[in-house]
UniProtKB/Swiss-Prot annotation:
It catalyses: dihydroxyacetone phosphate = methylglyoxal + phosphate. This is Methylglyoxal synthase. The active site is at residue 71. Catalyzes the formation of methylglyoxal from dihydroxyacetone phosphate. Belongs to the methylglyoxal synthase family. One of its GO terms (biological process) is methylglyoxal biosynthetic process. The keyword Lyase applies. Keywords: Lyase. It comes from Pectobacterium atrosepticum (strain SCRI 1043 / ATCC BAA-672) (Erwinia carotovora subsp. atroseptica).
Protein backbone atom coordinates (compact mmCIF):
# COMPACT_ATOMS: atom_id res chain seq x y z
CA UNK A 1 0.00 0.00 0.00
CA UNK A 2 1.29 3.42 -0.96
CA UNK A 3 0.64 6.40 1.28
CA UNK A 4 0.05 10.09 0.91
CA UNK A 5 -0.66 12.73 3.52
CA UNK A 6 -3.52 14.88 4.62
CA UNK A 7 -3.64 17.71 7.11
CA UNK A 8 -5.80 17.46 10.19
CA UNK A 9 -6.69 21.14 10.71
CA UNK A 10 -6.42 23.05 13.99
CA UNK A 11 -10.22 23.13 14.14
CA UNK A 12 -10.97 19.44 14.20
CA UNK A 13 -13.96 17.32 13.23
CA UNK A 14 -14.45 15.02 16.21
CA UNK A 15 -16.61 11.89 16.34
CA UNK A 16 -18.08 11.07 19.76
CA UNK A 17 -19.39 7.53 20.22
CA UNK A 18 -20.31 5.60 23.37
CA UNK A 19 -21.91 2.29 24.19
CA UNK A 20 -24.88 2.40 26.56
CA UNK A 21 -22.90 1.57 29.71
CA UNK A 22 -20.32 4.23 28.79
CA UNK A 23 -22.58 7.14 27.82
CA UNK A 24 -22.43 8.80 31.25
CA UNK A 25 -18.65 8.58 31.27
CA UNK A 26 -18.50 10.27 27.85
CA UNK A 27 -21.02 12.91 28.97
CA UNK A 28 -18.84 13.63 32.01
CA UNK A 29 -15.73 13.88 29.82
CA UNK A 30 -17.47 16.23 27.36
CA UNK A 31 -18.71 18.35 30.27
CA UNK A 32 -15.20 18.60 31.70
CA UNK A 33 -13.77 19.56 28.30
CA UNK A 34 -16.70 21.63 27.03
CA UNK A 35 -14.68 24.83 26.64
CA UNK A 36 -12.05 23.15 24.45
CA UNK A 37 -14.66 21.27 22.42
CA UNK A 38 -16.55 24.46 21.48
CA UNK A 39 -13.71 25.26 19.06
CA UNK A 40 -14.31 22.08 17.06
CA UNK A 41 -17.07 20.45 15.00
CA UNK A 42 -18.68 17.55 16.81
CA UNK A 43 -20.32 14.48 15.29
CA UNK A 44 -21.90 11.59 17.16
CA UNK A 45 -24.05 8.55 16.81
CA UNK A 46 -27.72 9.31 17.44
CA UNK A 47 -28.44 8.69 21.10
CA UNK A 48 -25.01 9.84 22.22
CA UNK A 49 -25.22 13.02 20.15
CA UNK A 50 -28.66 13.93 21.44
CA UNK A 51 -27.56 13.32 25.04
CA UNK A 52 -24.47 15.50 24.59
CA UNK A 53 -26.45 18.30 22.98
CA UNK A 54 -29.21 18.28 25.61
CA UNK A 55 -26.79 18.01 28.56
CA UNK A 56 -24.12 20.48 27.42
CA UNK A 57 -25.73 22.73 24.82
CA UNK A 58 -22.88 21.97 22.42
CA UNK A 59 -23.94 21.65 18.79
CA UNK A 60 -23.57 18.07 17.57
CA UNK A 61 -24.19 16.64 14.11
CA UNK A 62 -25.99 13.44 15.06
CA UNK A 63 -26.05 10.35 12.89
CA UNK A 64 -28.44 7.45 13.37
CA UNK A 65 -28.18 5.45 16.57
CA UNK A 66 -25.21 3.04 16.43
CA UNK A 67 -27.25 -0.18 16.07
CA UNK A 68 -29.40 1.46 13.39
CA UNK A 69 -26.42 2.35 11.17
CA UNK A 70 -24.82 5.29 12.97
CA UNK A 71 -21.49 3.50 13.45
CA UNK A 72 -21.38 2.88 9.71
CA UNK A 73 -22.24 6.52 8.99
CA UNK A 74 -19.33 7.66 11.17
CA UNK A 75 -17.11 5.10 9.42
CA UNK A 76 -18.11 6.52 6.05
CA UNK A 77 -17.17 10.03 7.22
CA UNK A 78 -13.79 8.70 8.35
CA UNK A 79 -13.24 7.09 4.93
CA UNK A 80 -14.09 10.40 3.25
CA UNK A 81 -11.56 12.31 5.38
CA UNK A 82 -14.33 14.22 7.17
CA UNK A 83 -13.51 13.00 10.70
CA UNK A 84 -10.14 13.95 12.19
CA UNK A 85 -10.27 12.07 15.47
CA UNK A 86 -12.65 9.85 17.38
CA UNK A 87 -13.50 9.49 21.04
CA UNK A 88 -15.19 6.09 21.34
CA UNK A 89 -15.98 4.90 24.85
CA UNK A 90 -16.86 1.27 24.17
CA UNK A 91 -17.80 -1.37 26.67
CA UNK A 92 -15.36 -4.31 26.48
CA UNK A 93 -17.32 -6.31 29.06
CA UNK A 94 -20.68 -6.42 27.28
CA UNK A 95 -21.33 -7.74 23.80
CA UNK A 96 -23.51 -5.59 21.58
CA UNK A 97 -25.70 -6.88 18.75
CA UNK A 98 -23.98 -4.56 16.28
CA UNK A 99 -20.46 -5.71 17.26
CA UNK A 100 -19.42 -6.21 13.59
CA UNK A 101 -20.22 -2.52 12.98
CA UNK A 102 -18.10 -1.54 15.99
CA UNK A 103 -15.17 -3.59 14.71
CA UNK A 104 -15.58 -2.06 11.24
CA UNK A 105 -15.60 1.46 12.72
CA UNK A 106 -12.38 0.84 14.65
CA UNK A 107 -10.83 -0.79 11.57
CA UNK A 108 -11.60 2.26 9.41
CA UNK A 109 -10.16 4.60 12.02
CA UNK A 110 -6.98 2.52 11.91
CA UNK A 111 -6.88 2.30 8.10
CA UNK A 112 -7.26 6.08 7.76
CA UNK A 113 -4.81 6.70 10.62
CA UNK A 114 -6.94 8.99 12.78
CA UNK A 115 -6.30 9.31 16.52
CA UNK A 116 -8.77 7.25 18.56
CA UNK A 117 -9.40 7.29 22.31
CA UNK A 118 -11.30 4.31 23.67
CA UNK A 119 -11.22 5.35 27.32
CA UNK A 120 -11.12 8.49 29.43
CA UNK A 121 -7.37 8.39 30.13
CA UNK A 122 -6.55 8.28 26.41
CA UNK A 123 -9.15 10.96 25.65
CA UNK A 124 -7.52 13.19 28.28
CA UNK A 125 -4.10 12.62 26.70
CA UNK A 126 -5.49 13.52 23.26
CA UNK A 127 -7.31 16.69 24.24
CA UNK A 128 -4.37 17.91 26.34
CA UNK A 129 -1.78 17.19 23.65
CA UNK A 130 -0.15 20.22 22.04
CA UNK A 131 -1.09 18.64 18.70
CA UNK A 132 -4.80 18.93 19.55
CA UNK A 133 -4.69 22.67 18.84
CA UNK A 134 -2.39 22.52 15.82
CA UNK A 135 -2.67 21.43 12.21
CA UNK A 136 -1.10 17.96 11.93
CA UNK A 137 0.06 16.00 8.89
CA UNK A 138 -0.91 12.33 8.92
CA UNK A 139 -0.13 9.52 6.51
CA UNK A 140 -3.18 8.01 4.82
CA UNK A 141 -3.63 5.38 2.13
CA UNK A 142 -3.18 6.74 -1.37
CA UNK A 143 -6.54 5.60 -2.65
CA UNK A 144 -6.01 6.81 -6.21
CA UNK A 145 -2.81 4.78 -6.53
CA UNK A 146 -4.51 1.81 -4.85
CA UNK A 147 -7.35 2.01 -7.37
CA UNK A 148 -4.97 2.33 -10.33
CA UNK A 149 -3.04 -0.74 -9.17
CA UNK A 150 -6.26 -2.73 -8.77
CA UNK A 151 -7.44 -1.81 -12.27
CA UNK A 152 -4.27 -3.00 -14.02
Amino acid sequence: MEFTTRTIPAQKHIALVAHDHCKQSLLDWVGTNKQQLTEHTLYATGTTGNLIQSNTGLPVKSMLSGPMGGDQQVGALISEGKIDLMIFFWDPLNAVPHDPDVKALLRLATVWNIPVATNRATADFLINSALFKEPVQIAIPDYQRYLQDRLK
